[in-house]
Amino acid sequence: GLFDIVKKIAGHIVSSI
């Protein structure tokens, strides 16, 4: 769902840090 996409993006940001 949409929330899954948000979580995926958030996880990508965390990984980028």
From Swiss-Prot:
Expressed by the skin dorsal glands. One of its GO terms (biological process) is defense response to bacterium. The keyword Secreted applies. GO terms for cellular component: extracellular region. It comes from the Eukaryota. Keywords: Amidation, Amphibian defense peptide, Antibiotic, Antimicrobial, Secreted. The keyword Secreted applies. It holds the Pfam family Antimicrobial20. Its main location: secreted. It is found in: Secreted. InterPro entries: Aurein_antimicrobial_peptide (IPR013157). The modification Isoleucine amide is found at residue 17. Belongs to the frog skin active peptide (FSAP) family. Aurein subfamily. Antimicrobial activity against L.lactis, M.luteus, P.multocida, S.aureus, S.epidermidis and S.uberis. Probably acts by disturbing membrane functions with its amphipathic structure. Shows anticancer activity. This is Aurein-3.3. It comes from Ranoidea raniformis. The lineage of its organism: Eukaryota, Metazoa, Chordata, Craniata, Vertebrata.
